[in-house]
A protein has these predicted regions:
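Divalent-cation
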Residues: 1-78, 84
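Polar-ligand-bearing catalytic/cofactor-coordination segments
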Residues: 2, 6, 77-81, 132, ...
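Hydrophobic alpha-helical membrane-embedded segments
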Residues: 11, 42-64, 142-167, 240-252
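Cytosolic juxtamembrane amphipathic/interface segments immediately preceding
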Residues: 35-41, 86-102, 188-194
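Juxtamembrane "helix exit" motif at the C-terminal ends of alpha-helical transmembrane segments
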Residues: 64-68, 109-134, 209-231, 237-240, ...
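Hydrophobic transmembrane alpha-helix segments characteristic of membrane transport
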Residues: 70-97, 102, 115-135
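Residue-level signature of transmembrane alpha-helical entry/exit and packing/kink sites
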Residues: 98, 102, 106, 138-146, ...
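Select subsegments of transmembrane alpha-helices in polytopic membrane proteins
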Residues: 99-117, 198-209
Length: 306
């Protein structure tokens, strides 16, 4: 996980700091799960598509990162005598295994996330129904429990050395974006002094999802516990879509109210981003430059500032 992924429209780049300390950059095309632009750009729906695509791209990126640390094992296999046909079959088999593993990991990740961050808070909140009669209060309590579990999880894994490095690369990603969005050349020195906090962040998105879910779940008024669970699951895509629209608005607006509502997400980034070192910043710069010609963009911002 020694790298940074940057996406610009239908192109994305993955820059990795290899074990030999060289930076390797891979640029790929990603058209998305829905190719019809009218459907892809529909409010709410675009947030659902973006969320799913982020999961898929995330798994592809992690698989690519891991490949650099499996090179020695692969090299040993290549030393074994094989015919060209046997090698081709072996590569096809490994590709199928990789795709199956990636698909299984995505499904498992979604199931675990729903179980821990959606279902567990719901069932814990039902324990208070004997002493709290208001369904509004129970729904609010469920949301508070969900936030505590989520923030606790983020804080706990930040204690792990490897995850801390992931958070440092996350910081490098934000600092690179902030650097060019503030009209500065994309250099190590400029990136270093840029902020590691950014409104359009996946961390902020997840927190907004938690907060928006409180509002939606307050209006679920059915007696059947099973039906309440089913309705929560069905509302997840809608909640993700609404949350995406807010994050999109926050990234484009300097409105005082929007800035205030964005604060919790920025505070949470205090946990999910750390100050990167210069080598990490170099990786971030390589990733940006692979998919985005930042110089004309920076020039335009400078003209607007005059």
């Amino acid at each position: 996980m020694e790298g940074v992924m940057m996406k610009n429209q239908e192109k994305y780049a993955v820059a990795v700091r290899k074990p030999d300390h060289e930076i390797e950059v891979k640029v790929s095309e990603y058209t998305g799960i829905i190719r019809n632009k009218k459907i892809r750009n529909m409010p709410i729906l675009r947030g659902v598509f973006s969320f799913i695509e982020s999961l898929v791209l995330g798994m592809q990126t992690l698989t690519y990162y891991a490949s650099f640390f499996e090179d020695e094992e692969v090299d040993e296999k290549k030393k074994e005598p094989m015919t060209e046909e046997e090698r081709r079959r072996q590569e096809q088999k490994e590709k199928k295994q990789e795709n199956a593993m990636m698909g299984g990991t995505v499904v498992l990740s979604i199931v675990l996330a729903v179980a821990v961050f959606m279902m567990l808070p719901y069932y814990l909140s039902t324990l208070f129904q004997k002493v709290i009669t208001s369904q509004w209060v129970i729904a609010l309590l469920e949301g508070v429990i969900r936030l505590v579990i989520f923030i606790g999880y983020v804080a706990l894994i930040s204690l792990m050395k490897d995850i801390r490095r992931v958070y440092m690369y996350h910081g490098a990603e934000h600092k690179c974006i902030n650097c060019i969005e503030h009209g500065m050349d994309l250099t190590v020195d400029n990136v270093r002094k840029s902020s590691r906090f950014h409104k359009r962040c996946g961390t902020s998105f997840l927190l907004i999802v938690m907060l928006v879910s409180i509002l939606f779940f307050m209006f679920i008024r059915v007696d059947s516990p099973i039906l309440r669970v089913v309705l929560r699951l069905l509302l997840i895509p809608v909640i993700a879509g609404v949350s995406y629209e807010f994050i999109r608005l926050a990234g484009r607006s300097d409105n005082a109210v929007v800035n205030l509502l964005s604060k919790p997400g920025l505070w949470l980034q205090g946990l999910t981003t750390k100050e990167p070192d210069d080598e990490m910043i170099e990786v971030g710069i390589a990733s940006v430059e692979a998919v985005f010609d930042w110089k004309p963009y920076v020039e335009e911002i400078r003209r607007e500032m005059k």
